[in-house]
From Swiss-Prot:
Quaternary state and interactors: Heterodimer with MEIS1 and MEIS2.
Any Pfam family hit: HoxA13_N
Residue segments, region Interaction with DNA: 219-248, 272-275
Molecular-function GO terms, alphabetical: DNA-binding transcription repressor activity, RNA polymerase II-specific; methyl-CpG binding; sequence-specific double-stranded DNA binding
Record-given protein name: Homeobox protein Hox-B13
Free-text function comment from the UniProt entry: Sequence-specific transcription factor which is part of a developmental regulatory system that provides cells with specific positional identities on the anterior-posterior axis. Binds preferentially to methylated DNA.
Primary gene name: Hoxb13
Length: 286
């Protein structure tokens, strides 16, 4: 044998003596080109398996079935070992090519770690889904599969999903009878017609109030005084323009009018006389 071969064997023996039998086997297994290392699966669900396979074992390395929802031609960015914590391998797929599959529930159960700022991929597209009524965009939370709820980035042929939060359209209140109509209870509407007929018609005759509803009436209808009542009031006014309490009680008993009605009539009668005198005065002066 040549001297170079002897030197190589002596160096190997020294290394084996320093590291021990176990260390030498591990070193040889790592340095040997024929050692079979488990390669990180490209597109598959998380699977736990042994980190190293001893060389020369008859059992072939474990192969995982690819996810049926991911196209075979896609090439995602590689993910380092231990990225999501534990001894599991995982893969991150672009959102547009990810479709719902039966393994979604199994993937969502595994815990995940929030990646550091340096480990975030710059080529990953940013996606925001805006919901009506919320000021900020939807932010995905940890420990869930990174799948958008509302599809915003996708192929043109794929169907778009409508908003999951229904928003009722604004409908203004419609008043059938206009603003002049008197609305008492729910469901009461005036019949169509000219507004002056609805305004001057008697509310109690046109629409009788239903049971359990207090009808709000406008101005009370004026009841004219009889000739006998007016004669008694005019006679007292001619005697005294300001009525006293005793006279008011006597007239109230004689005319069947309330004391308030008599007081108001005397006030109106004084105003009327004042207007008549002012009109006569303006007509006589040149």
């Amino acid at each position: 044998m040549e001297p170079g071969n002897y030197a190589t064997l002596d160096g190997a023996k020294d290394i084996e003596g320093l590291l021990g039998a176990g260390g030498g086997r591990n070193l040889v297994s790592h340095s040997s080109p024929l050692a079979s290392h488990p390669a990180a699966p490209t597109l598959m669900p998380t699977v736990n398996y042994a980190p190293l396979d001893l060389p020369g074992s008859a059992e072939p390395p474990k192969q995982c079935h690819p996810c049926p929802g991911v196209p075979q031609g896609a090439s995602p960015a590689p993910v380092p070992y231990g990225y999501f914590g534990g001894g599991y391998y995982s893969c991150r797929v672009s959102r547009s090519s990810l479709k719902p599959c039966a393994q979604t529930a199994a993937l969502a159960t595994y815990p995940s770690e929030t990646p550091a700022p340096g480990e975030e991929y710059p080529s990953r597209p940013t996606e925001f889904a805006f919901y009506p009524g919320y000021p900020g965009p939807y932010q995905p939370m940890a420990s869930y599969l990174d799948v958008s709820v509302v599809q915003t980035l996708g192929a043109p042929g794929e169907p778009r999903h409508d908003s999951l939060l229904p928003v009722d359209s604004y409908q203004p209140w419609a008043l059938a009878g206009g603003w002049n109509s008197q609305m008492c209870c729910q469901g009461e509407q005036n019949p169509p017609g000219p507004f002056w007929k609805a305004a001057f018609a008697e509310p109690s005759v046109q629409h009788p109030p239903p049971d359990g509803c207090a009808f709000r009436r406008g101005r009370k209808k004026r009841i004219p005084y009889s000739k006998g009542q007016l004669r008694e009031l005019e006679r007292e006014y001619a005697a005294n323009k300001f009525i006293t309490k005793d006279k008011r009680r006597k007239i109230s008993a004689a005319t069947s009018l309330s004391e308030r009605q008599i007081t108001i009539w005397f006030q109106n009668r004084r105003v009327k006389e004042k207007k008549v005198l002012a009109k006569v005065k303006t007509s006589t002066t040149p």
